[in-house]
Amino acid sequence: MARAPPPLSSLPPPPRRPTVVLLLGLALAFCLAVLSIQSSFFTAPRLASRLDLDSDEVRALSGFQSRVQQCVARRGLGLTADIIDHCKLVLRFPKGTNSTWYNTQFKYFEPLEYNYDVCETILLWEQYRNMTTVLTREYLDVRPDGWLDYAAKRIAQLGADKCYNRTLCEELLSVLLPAKPPFHPRQFATCAVVGNSGDLLKTEFGQEIDAHDAVFRDNEAPVNKKYAKYVGLKRDFRLVVRGAARNMAPILKGSSDEVLIIKSLTHKEINAVIKELPNPVYLFQGIVLRRGAKGTGMKSIELALSMCDIIDMYGFTVDPNYTEWTRYFSPPRKGHNPLQGRAYYQLLECLGVIRIHSPMRAKRVEDWSDIPSREEIRTAHAAAFRLKRHETGQSDQMGPFSNCKVWGTVDPDYGPVSGTPDMSETRKSSNYKKWEVLPFDSLRMEAQEHHVQMGGVSLYKMDGNKLDDLVCVRHERSSS
């Protein structure tokens, strides 16, 4: 039998509605809606304008990515490029590639795919065409704490973490520290960067290498009649690590004009050797590539790009089925991650930074038409630059000085040439300082024009891979 409902008098009273709180909430929501509409009204045109601008850059970069993808497919010896977006892509080696390189630090075999940001890469390397890559006195003078902090990082066995005794640090650096840049952007039209790979013995590149305006070599790689038909005889620049710098006398034997660039540090023992040599010797001033190829070869490309229009690269080939790291003049040895380097070099070729010459391409007639043209690269660089500026909220100022963080000015008579009073008579009587005292009007016309376009300003990297931090030094013109 159904139970009758309780009388109304026995039901609990309905809860009181928080009318005041509810009304306040509605009022607040209404105000926020009005504020949002007003904000949208005033910001929508600016946002739309920015989106339109960004979309233009995205379209330009997407088209460039397609060109890079096609270039990798044609020139990559099996490598393929998968586009992620307008800036990012992945380079992949084919399945079955022999990945035998074991990273003992992180406990894994070398991977077969590598992620790259093309926008970041093209900004970095195109900027290098305007850079100075030799450490100078003007850089240390202009950079904040240049002598106290940075100079100490370039001297081994200093006994302190900073140059508290500047006089001592100047004594240790003076033998290889020019006052101003001894080399200039656009100084050479064509340059060859010659590595040490055993693949060089498979093709006779010697005459082709020697035909370049300047040749860059690494560490202790020999240049003699035995290997002349493979690697040539021309010797202009040599980039060495500190260990090889200790043996620079036998390395440089036979060429008093070959310029030696020490990649990392100097110290008393190296300085003692320099004082006996007739060769120009300097310290490298560059960047740290954490996601690119490793080793002295990559630094040689950086060095060459700061002086040369076209860079041809020999002796860095890695066959996809490599089994060991080989050198043309000695037994196989431990080296750097070959596949990572091979992938990055291929990316650089398809960005117009280098041209790779390989025994695996020897039977081909070299045709560079599948590499993006300089005009395409300039367009992509401008798009990447503007996009980066908008993303970081910076101004649209274009030009080579937009990333200058520190400015300085030096007069025409600034600073001494490199050297010390206790150098040997061999060095004092040599022509080691010829690049430092080279008359401006003897430079290649393109180098002179670039200098004028830059307003006599030299650009230096400040720290690591940061694209936005440059030390910029303006050289005042002589009144005569």
From Swiss-Prot:
The chain crosses the membrane at residues 18-38. Keywords: Glycoprotein, Glycosyltransferase, Golgi apparatus, Membrane, Signal-anchor, Transferase, Transmembrane, Transmembrane helix. It is found in: Golgi apparatus membrane. GO terms for cellular component: Golgi membrane; Golgi trans cisterna. Residues 39-480 are lumenal. The keyword Transferase applies. Pfam families: Glyco_transf_29. GO terms for biological process: pollen germination; pollen tube growth; protein glycosylation. GO terms for molecular function: sialyltransferase activity. Glycans are attached at residues 98, 130, 165, 321. Its EC number is 2.4.-.-. InterPro entries: Glyco_trans_29 (IPR001675), GT29-like_sf (IPR038578), SIA1/STLP5 (IPR044782). It is an enzyme of class 2 (transferase). It is a single-pass type II membrane protein. Residues 1-17 are cytoplasmic. May possess sialyltransferase-like activity in vitro. Belongs to the glycosyltransferase 29 family. PANTHER family: SIALYLTRANSFERASE-LIKE PROTEIN 1 (PTHR47486:SF1). This is Sialyltransferase-like protein 5. It comes from Oryza sativa subsp. japonica (Rice). The gene is STLP5.
